[in-house]
Amino acid sequence: MANILHIDSSPRGDRSISRKLSYEFLTSWKDTHPGDTVTYRDLGHNPVPHVDEPWIAAAFSSPDSHTPELKAAIELSDTLIDEFLAADRFVFGVPMYNLNIPSTFKAYIDQIVRVGRTFSVDANGYKGLVDSSKKVLIITSRGGSYPPGTPYAAYDYQEPYLRAILGFMGLTDVTFIHAESLNMGEDAREKSLADAKDAIAQAVANW
């Protein structure tokens, strides 16, 4: 049995493609893995705050020296990190906004990427502290298309960033399913959604 952390980051509700597809995956997954548990966090509708000066002061100082104010500043981060580390697998629904991820998801990442908790640093450099055997599935929605080897590939700051920051914490087994070309005409949209649903079915069988 596994504990899956499912995160949606779109501010949209029923109109969100990334929500629908991540839900479709988890529903099918639960049918074939009924013993697994799912922890759900909705960043689109319940965003976490951006880091601020008290947060930074707390994150880069010894807990033994924390005042009540600093303890309060880092409390949510500790909760989010504990939740993140307790997961065995991760499913993220992430739309592309302006070539990158939503600010809600970036704020969450900033809360959980913390020295001494999810990464360490010494004279030899950085080391991820999250178990590298844990798998990540990221389902994205995109208005355009950014195929490798084309001029548009350079515009994709979504997948490269997520691979980099997850790898920084130690998570390197990352699978992407892109529902793209959603604003490039009805035919392209329908084909991309069908391809994404096929990829979801394959992920349910093989992930």
Curated annotation (Swiss-Prot):
The keyword Oxidoreductase appears for this protein: yes
Annotated family: Belongs to the azoreductase type 1 family.
Gene3D superfamilies in UniProt: 3.40.50.360
SUPFAM superfamilies: Flavoproteins
EC number: 1.6.5.-, 1.7.1.17
Keywords: Flavoprotein, FMN, NAD, Oxidoreductase
Keyword rRNA-binding: no
A Pfam family: Flavodoxin_2
Binding sites annotated in the UniProt record for FMN: S10, S16, I17, S18, M96, Y97, N98, L99, S141, R142, G143, G144
Catalytic activity line of the entry: 2 a quinone + NADH + H(+) = 2 a 1,4-benzosemiquinone + NAD(+); N,N-dimethyl-1,4-phenylenediamine + anthranilate + 2 NAD(+) = 2-(4-dimethylaminophenyl)diazenylbenzoate + 2 NADH + 2 H(+)
GO MF annotation terms: electron transfer activity; FMN binding; oxidoreductase activity, acting on NAD(P)H as acceptor; oxidoreductase activity, acting on NAD(P)H, quinone or similar compound as acceptor
Subunit details: Homodimer.
Encoding gene per record: azoR2
Cofactor dependence: FMN
Cofactor note: Binds 1 FMN per subunit.
Enzyme class per UniProt: oxidoreductase
Identification of the protein by name: FMN-dependent NADH:quinone oxidoreductase 2
Function as written in the Swiss-Prot or TrEMBL entry: Quinone reductase that provides resistance to thiol-specific stress caused by electrophilic quinones.
